[in-house]
A protein has these predicted regions:
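NAD(P)-dependent Rossmann-like dehydrogenase/reductase catalytic/cofactor-binding core
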Residues: 186-309
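Conserved beta-strand segments of alpha/beta enzyme cores
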Residues: 25-27, 72, 94, 140
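Rossmann-like NAD(P)(H) cofactor-binding subdomain of soluble oxidoreductases
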Residues: 33-109
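Internal alpha-helical scaffold of NAD(P)-dependent oxidoreductase catalytic cores
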Residues: 15, 88, 94, 109-201
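NAD(P)+-binding Rossmann beta1-loop-alpha1 motif at the extreme N-terminus of oxidoreductases
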Residues: 1-40
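Alpha-helical elements of the RecA-like P-loop NTPase motor core of helicases
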Residues: 13, 55-56, 83, 128, ...
Length: 309
């Protein structure tokens, strides 16, 4: 098996490195170099490109004459189906989407692909080879016939990028609580991995832990008070996250409904307070801006400016 990857960004580099470790011959070509001018020597062509690049690149490849008839072409975009490569259908053995549900954050530090899932959907031969490729990377190929790729990609982004955003706030909260900032990510990484393990092994609702699950309104109230004093900008996110946990906690049933109701009241009160503070802050900024405009056009200011001329 020979693989040609067009696109040397985070995904392309990570896939190339992982494939080479498995002894697979890989050619990695940066997208900035454009479509090759000579015949591609590969049975699988992977387009590791941005969504907006796929249609024009597919069209260029289709008319370039460099795609072997025996090759299949796949793309790694999560929100786009195989049909975005439609111009290539007549010049190769098949097209497919091959999206790894993995977070690629760096050009140099690659994520572990093992046990990751890959959504594969397209023409039969392209699906077959994409599945083979995924298995060589020790990943699990999946195909959902009626998949809405936009919703699928939104779910992946919500979890991957939402978790990163939550962790960033967590770093700030640890820092204002006495943890050296450089140490905070090292502490949160294993925590996130344990959450991932729980989600995979237990599913929901059982993967939820913490004071909301236990119905501990007192603990949540103390945390809200601390956030309000030391990191008020994080309070709306903290409260919204807590409210999202409530229905999960209700499904688990560890805490009495009365305790969960108390938790809900504490969170809703905090959310209203955060909203009121935001409105006051916004109003203050508007008033300050209006004041500056009024002052800048006052007679004394105008007189001073004229006197300088």
């Amino acid at each position: 098996m020979k693989v040609f990857i067009l696109g040397a960004g985070k995904v392309g580099r990570a896939l190339a490195a992982a494939l080479k470790k498995q002894g697979i011959k890989v050619t990695l070509r940066p997208a900035r170099k454009g479509v090759p001018t000579t015949k591609i020597d590969a049975s699988i062509i992977v387009l590791a490109l941005r969504d907006r690049q796929l249609p024009p690149v597919a069209a260029d490849l289709a008319t370039s004459g460099v795609v072997p008839r025996r090759a299949v072409v796949v793309h790694n975009a999560g929100s786009l189906p195989a049909d975005v490569l439609e111009p290539l259908r007549g010049v190769c053995a098949g097209i497919a989407q091959m999206h790894p549900m993995i977070s690629f954050a760096s050009l140099d530090v690659f994520p572990t692909l093992t046990r990751g899932h890959v959504h594969v959907k397209g023409d039969a031969e392209a699906e077959k080879r994409a599945r083979t490729l995924a298995k060589k990377l020790h990943m699990t190929p999946r195909t959902f016939a009626a998949l809405d790729t936009v919703g699928y990609h939104a779910a992946a982004g919500l979890v991957a990028n939402g978790a990163a955003a939550l962790a960033a706030i967590g770093v700030e909260l640890l820092a204002v609580s006495g943890v050296p900032r450089a140490e905070a990510p090292k502490m949160l990484g294993p925590l996130l991995r344990s959450v991932a393990d729980n989600v995979e092994a237990l599913g929901f609702p059982d993967a939820l832990t913490g004071p909301v699950r236990r119905g501990d309104a007192g603990a949540i109230g103390r945390q809200i008070e601390l956030l309000g004093e030391r990191l008020p900008e994080a309070l709306p996110l903290f409260v919204t996250s807590g409210l999202a946990q409530l229905p999960i906690a209700e499904r688990i049933g560890d805490a009495p409904k009365t305790d969960l109701a108390k938790v809900g009241k504490v969170l809703e009160k905090a959310l209203r307070g955060a909203g009121a503070r935001a409105r006051r802050a916004s109003g203050g900024k508007k008033a300050s801006s209006a004041g500056r405009r009024a002052t800048s056009s006052s007679p004394s200011r105008l007189h001073k400016r004229r006197s300088r001329t």
